[in-house]
């Protein structure tokens, strides 16, 4: 009963709690459903916003691309508009020329029929130009319409004046000649621009060469400084060793030398000092020569820096030579270019190369033939290189001025044939048999115009081999300059080798002299030792031992021998002491014997 009393309230409490929980659960579920609905709505809105944002971003990207495309089109249209304005100006010039022709046509009305055909050709040409301009500038409609209007007006003007044309054929022919002349001038201007481009390339090449030479000069300077440093250290080391050795020997023997021995030693040392001074002079001369060579290289670098300015004047001279027809003038110009290359190669005129050196050659019939090569380049070991300048430019000039491919091919063949003819003529001279000249097995044939030289080799692959078979080497300015610079370096190395041999020879002589000096000095020392031993023996006989000369002489004085001089006291005392000591030793020896 009591249990029921307790359980009933508890059950009621539990029921209330469950009921309350169910009510709260239903409320919470409703609120949770509302929250889920709100979240779903917000998620849908977010998706919509993101989709809209993506669409806006896509549209912005498309608009940005269109904007850039429009900018590019605007830039292209601007360029085309500028080009069209230039064409319009050109057409306006042509229109002005048409007006001038119209005035000429009005003045000369008798030959209208002859000009009609030409006017039709001009109209056709203008139509072709109009079509080309229309195709090229399709986007510029207003400009195209203006061009078409101008062309139509020009054609109408031409048609209006056709009935009034007179003696205009000659004038129009003159105009055609003038146009052809202008075209030639334009072609010449194009060639000059190409020449200018080539000169700029050469200038760039020279700049690279300048940098290379500067690097080479710096390397040679460092090598020379290192050599001089080593020579200076060797000289200082040898001098210190000689001085230390001489001082050591002199310090050991100085207390034994007499005035006569010192004089003899000076006589022995003087040749050694002279050799050392000669070695120092040789080192100084080597340093001065290296300094002069560095100065020569610096001057050469300055000349190379000024070569760009010289090329401009040489280009003008080249133009005059190309347009000239006198072979003598072209030959002189080729020799001038050859001498310019030689001057810039670093070789010394008159010493390492000779210009226009005359010589003779014996013929098979017993006679002699006088030959005069343009340049003889001397090599070490009494060898020479023969260089002969050959200018072959007439056909080359016509080739550069050719109006069509057939003419160009014909003139190119003539240019190669001209070079081959020069080569055959040079091979007949046979410079290798000149008296007093020890040439190599081949001769350099110098072509002063680099493009003409390269053009011939590029279009005739067998030309170089044919020249080589005839012991002729084809060279242009660049290849010859590289070869001559190599020869200059060979001469510098030869001079340095000769200096090194001279230094080695002087060093060998110095070493031999030093060995002789040491041997002589050893002999002097031995002689001094022998003299010292003889001196000690003689001194013992004089003042030491029993019966020495000083004691005997002093006894004679004490016995009454008349003398004007007297021996030194310390010498007589020493003689008496040694005599007494000797007698005492003899007495002791006798007592021991007894």
UniProtKB/Swiss-Prot annotation:
It comes from the Bacteria. This is DNA recombination protein RmuC homolog. Residues 31-330 form a coiled coil. The lineage of its organism: Bacteria, Pseudomonadati, Pseudomonadota, Betaproteobacteria, Neisseriales. The keyword Coiled coil applies. Involved in DNA recombination. Belongs to the RmuC family. Pfam families: RmuC. One of its GO terms (biological process) is DNA recombination. InterPro entries: DNA_recombination_RmuC. Keywords: Coiled coil, DNA recombination.
């Amino acid at each position: 009963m009591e249990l029921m009393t307790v359980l009933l309230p508890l059950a009621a409490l539990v029921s209330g709690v469950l009921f309350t929980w169910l009510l709260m659960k239903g409320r919470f579920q409703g609120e949770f459903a509302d929250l889920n609905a709100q979240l779903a709505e917000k998620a849908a809105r977010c998706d919509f916003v993101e989709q809209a944002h993506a669409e806006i971003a896509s549209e912005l990207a498309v608009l940005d691309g269109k904007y850039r495309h429009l900018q590019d089109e605007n830039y292209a249209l601007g360029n085309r508009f500028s080009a069209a304005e230039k064409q319009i100006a050109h057409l306006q010039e042509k229109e002005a020329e048409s007006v001038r022709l119209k005035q000429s046509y009005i003045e000369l009305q008798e030959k209208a029929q002859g000009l009609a055909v030409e006017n039709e050709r001009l109209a056709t040409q203008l139509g072709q130009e109009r079509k080309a301009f229309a195709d090229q500038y399709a986007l510029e409609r207003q400009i195209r319409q203006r061009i078409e209007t101008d062309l139509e007006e020009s054609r109408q003007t031409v048609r209006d004046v056709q009935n009034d044309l007179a003696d205009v054929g000659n004038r129009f022919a003159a105009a055609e000649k003038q146009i052809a002349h202008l075209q030639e001038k334009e072609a010449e201007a194009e060639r000059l621009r190409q020449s200018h481009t080539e000169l700029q390339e050469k200038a760039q090449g020279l700049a690279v060469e300048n940098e290379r030479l500067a690097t080479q000069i710096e390397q040679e300077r460092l090598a020379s400084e290192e050599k001089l440093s080593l020579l200076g250290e060797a000289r200082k080391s040898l001098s210190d060793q000689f001085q230390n050795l001489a001082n050591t020997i002199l310090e050991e023997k100085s207390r034994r030398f007499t005035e006569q021995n010192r004089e003899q030693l000076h006589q022995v040392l003087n040749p050694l000092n002279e050799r050392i001074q000669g070695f120092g002079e040789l080192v100084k001369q080597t340093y001065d020569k290296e300094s002069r060579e560095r100065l020569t290289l610096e001057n050469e670098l300055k000349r190379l820096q000024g070569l760009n300015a010289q090329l401009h004047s040489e280009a003008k001279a080249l133009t005059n030579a190309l347009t000239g027809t006198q072979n003598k003038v072209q030959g002189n110009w080729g020799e001038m270019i050859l001498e310019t290359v030689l001057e810039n190669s670093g070789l010394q005129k008159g010493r390492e190369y000779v210009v226009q050196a005359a010589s003779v050659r014996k013929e098979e019939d017993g006679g002699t033939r006088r030959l005069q090569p343009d340049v003889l380049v001397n090599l070490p070991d009494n060898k020479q290189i023969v260089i002969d300048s050959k200018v072959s430019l007439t056909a080359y000039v016509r080739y550069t001025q050719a109006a069509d491919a057939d003419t160009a091919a014909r003139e190119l063949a003539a240019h190669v044939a001209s070079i081959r003819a020069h080569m055959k003529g040079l091979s007949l001279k046979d410079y290798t048999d000149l008296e007093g000249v020890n040439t190599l097995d081949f001769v350099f044939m110098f072509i002063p115009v680099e493009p003409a030289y390269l053009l011939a080799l590029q279009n005739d692959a067998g030309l170089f081999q044919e020249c080589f078979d005839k012991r002729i080497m084809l060279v242009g300015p660049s290849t010859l300059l590289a070869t001559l610079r190599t020869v200059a370096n060979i001469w510098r190395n030869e001079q340095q080798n000769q200096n090194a041999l001279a230094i080695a020879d002087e060093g060998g002589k110095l070493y031999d002299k030093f060995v002789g000096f040491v041997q002589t000095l050893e002999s002097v020392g031995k002689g001094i030792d022998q003299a010292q031993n003889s001196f000690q023996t003689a001194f013992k006989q004089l003042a030491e031992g029993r019966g020495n000369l000083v004691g005997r002489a002093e006894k004679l004085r004490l016995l009454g021998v008349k003398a004007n001089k007297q021996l030194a006291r310390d010498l007589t005392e020493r003689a008496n002491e040694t005599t007494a000591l000797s007698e005492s030793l003899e007495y002791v020896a006798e007592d021991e014997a007894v």
